């Protein structure tokens, strides 16, 4: 089983490294998506750079990456801790893809795919909460930030009604997913548009809004040419 786990973790990282947003932007617009819009290699920036239809495709693809690898782990009868390791590797691949010199996306939808396969109810919360309460105010990233804090608490305190059979492993898995998100946001290269932003504010903006400045519109277009 150890060999299977190691191989699936490696496979998860490689599958996660497939940069759908980058490939779509290259194919449809002939551009490097990292140099346009917000610069993020993800579905949201695909919407800005390429368009709605292809943004939907990238969303489905990125969710599918995470879900597929957990499904493979389930087929091998792995426990929750082992499945979480595979899922985390897939998200790390998306965030730091070997195929793009480790300059990837934020892993939001890949994380959603992983969470949904680990616990459908937690996946539902992770999807509904940001879009129900924050999308009307165009602050989905803030919703993602808060729901990622809520999920481990929910897994720990409400595991029985949610049908979570391995609450400790699930809770720890959710905490690690939160940490991966935080590390990804804080280690992203600083954008020139934020050169006058104090470090404390920069960290706050990244943790809460996943951007370097407070102005959302200016951020999503700061690399547009």
Where does each model-flagged region fall?
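Short, non-helical or kinked segments that cap or interrupt transmembrane helices
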Residues: 31-42, 98-115, 139-150
């Amino acid at each position: 089983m150890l060999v299977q786990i190691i191989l699936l973790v490696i496979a998860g990282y490689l599958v996660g490294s497939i940069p759908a947003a980058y490939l779509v932007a290259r194919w449809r617009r002939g551009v490097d998506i990292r140099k346009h819009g917000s610069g993020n290699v993800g579905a949201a920036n695909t919407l800005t750079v390429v368009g709605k239809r292809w943004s939907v495709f990238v969303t489905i693809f990125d969710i599918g990456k995470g879900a597929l690898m957990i499904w493979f782990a389930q087929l091998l009868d792995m426990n929750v801790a082992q499945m979480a390791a595979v899922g985390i590797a897939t998200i790390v691949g998306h965030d730091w893809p070997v195929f793009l010199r480790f300059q990837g996306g934020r892993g939001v939808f890949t994380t959603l795919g992983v969470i949904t396969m680990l616990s459908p109810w937690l996946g539902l919360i992770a999807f509904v909460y940001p879009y129900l309460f924050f999308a009307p105010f165009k602050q989905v990233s803030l919703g993602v930030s808060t729901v990622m804090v809520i999920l481990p608490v929910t897994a720990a305190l409400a595991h029985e009604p949610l049908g979570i059979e391995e609450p400790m492993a699930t809770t720890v898995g959710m905490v690690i997913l939160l940490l991966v998100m935080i590390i990804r946001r804080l280690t992203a290269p600083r954008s020139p548009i934020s050169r006058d932003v104090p470090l404390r504010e920069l960290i706050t903006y990244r943790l809460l809004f996943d951007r370097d400045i407070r102005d959302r519109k200016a951020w999503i277009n700061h690399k547009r040419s």
